[in-house]
Amino acid sequence: IMAKGLAKKEDWRTFVEATDTQYYEETMLQGMIIGLAKMELEERIHYIRLFVPRINNWAVCDIFSGELKKTAVGKGKETVWQFIQPYLKSKEEYEIRFGIVMLFHYVDEDHIDSLLEYADLFTHEAYYARMAMAWMISICFIKFPDKTMKYLKQSKLDNWTYNKSLQKIIESLRVDKETKDIIRSMKRAG
């Protein structure tokens, strides 16, 4: 509610451009305002670019990425797809997590093959980056079970991320018991 109110004020840009935020809540509000405020896609991308380096935890990352579904991805899906590509190669834990969580908006017929190809190239060591990848694979499985199952059977993912992907699939309420039993049997040692 607070973010929506601030996003409607004329001076929201001053608050969003402030880089001296000390508190989690301030950073969260900035991200939400970037997602909610009325602006053209080009301006929103400008503010996204400024904001991503400020992300320092999974909650800010995930809520920020969720806020961008309608206002960024919904306004220029392929433009945003191109924009997030460098983040998918970042060495920074929360920059790459931002890129991966943004990929959740692309689990569709046009992008599923690219997402699974990217997953096989993924080698980041950071915990929150690996968790995001496991989460993305579980979403891919829910929406594209056959393609994702085929991917999992030949996946080059490291064992930890692979097994965490299986765990997330098993935890899903949208996967039936028989499929969960198959997924359990696919766990790798280590």
Model-found features: residue ranges?
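Alpha-helical scaffold domains
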Residues: 1-190
